[in-house]
Amino acid sequence: IAPSVNNKGVVVANLGTVGIASGEAVTVDFVGNDLIAFAIDKSVEGQVLDKDGNLINDRISNSGSIQAKGGQAILTARNASDIIKNVINMEGRIEAHSVVKKDGRIFLGGGDEGNVNIAGNLNTSGESSGDSGGEIFVQGASVILDKSLIQAKGKDAKGGDITITGTSWLSVGGQIDASGDSGGNIKLTAGGLSIAAPILAQGSTGQGGSININSLSRSWENVDALLDVSGATGGSIQNFTVQQITASGKYLALGNDGKGGSIDVTASSLKFMSNTMDASGTKGGGTIRLGGEYQGGKNLSVDEIQNAETLLMTDAAQITAKVTGTEGDGGRIIVWADQQAAVFGQIDVTPGTQTGAGGFVEVSSADTLTFGAKVLTGINDRTGTLLLDPKNITIASSGGNGSGAFSLTAMMGSGYSGGKNFNQSLDTRDNFGASVSLDGNRL
């Protein structure tokens, strides 16, 4: 415990606790179960200088190695000055592997106003067969994961729990992994969020885990973003953002030996660029809900997810909940927006190649829908259903310059349609599934 702590060496406390705290007054609490908690009663104010009189930018810095197998590592600091760069700067390694059924734990707490930068490794993975993943908790005002590796993997056991909170901003530029025999749980909470790296909670022989994302403002995902909860049966992904989601990455909830999982994505404004969302399974398709529930949750007493106001999906997007094996029913996909939806891309809920019923797709809006997607719901006489039930609908070309021009104009913000709508009748050039329902009298 000191105003500033810098570790460049090796600290070992297997089955014990390594605690590093920056503050002028700190309370140590023995909370039971061999765990210790630190509370900063008074943070350090003003400058902190090294022995040579040089300004120290970080309250806690670790470029070395901290090891607490079967124990816990706690780094905690609070910011009371605008002078410092980071309250926690983690460029080295912290390992609290789970051993002999004793889960490891890593806690990095930067307080409500501190910046936390992680460019190293955090690891609470199981070390021997049968050891589950441990727990990792990271919290700060701004949390930057810069080519880091955060792992809580199970060794022939369940993955662990990883919770990361950036109250103003969270940037995921390094891999997060809670995979195991069955997947663990990953929770990301942020003011604003960017994802440019894999986030994994895969199950090798059991069910995939869960990834839950909550953002108060906006969420961006580039082509390097991968959210994967695949397993023998698929797990669950939820991305609930208040204002806007712009997605170009991949969401996977595959069932490699069973039914696909579930994917729920919603925000007031949704923009699906070149992204892939796949909840397919070898024995049954899963469920994908983008922007709302069936008919916008019209007949539900309590909505499970908020409705999007606008939704834009380019023709490069692929949304799939099909059966990848010979037997099984196709999945269920809902694409919804209260005000305006423009949906191109490809949607697939086809059943097994030999048996199984076709799946269900609803693409709609409480007001205006422009539709030019390619939708597959059935195979031969094993038909599925495509439901288009907006108040107003425009059927657009499912490819070529029409959909691309419309999507690009809408994405750039020059009016919702930019005058690029195409009024066409359904014909053989439009790729729909086996059955189409148009219901304009629902409202």
Which residues does each PLM region occupy?
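Extracellular and secretory-pathway beta-repeat/beta-biased strand scaffolds
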Residues: 1-443
